[in-house]
Amino acid sequence: MYDLTGFQRDLLLVVAGLDEPHGLAVKEEMEEYYEKEVHHGRLYPNLDTLVEKGLIKKGERDQRTNYYTLTARGDREIADRQQWEATYLSD
């Protein structure tokens, strides 16, 4: 996960926290967090990068809608990151 941008890490966490979200649901969550519009031209290429890296999987819900799920590798990467952060953030 060290090679991801902050935006990509945030996307990964959103996908992990939602139940098979479609792109628009991910977009809405990101906009709520960032408090500004997230354009499709930023969102979908970064989701595709996470798919290419094997951190999330893209499935097809219907002909127009894709959904995203966390892979086992994505889950491990998040757990490793949380453990690393805890090393520096623990009391």
Which residues fall in each region the model found?
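Basic amphipathic alpha-helical segments that dock to polyanions
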Residues: L43-K53
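Short acidic, hydrophobic short linear motifs in intrinsically disordered regions
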Residues: P21-E31
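Amphipathic alpha-helical dimerization/coiled-coil segments
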Residues: R81-D91
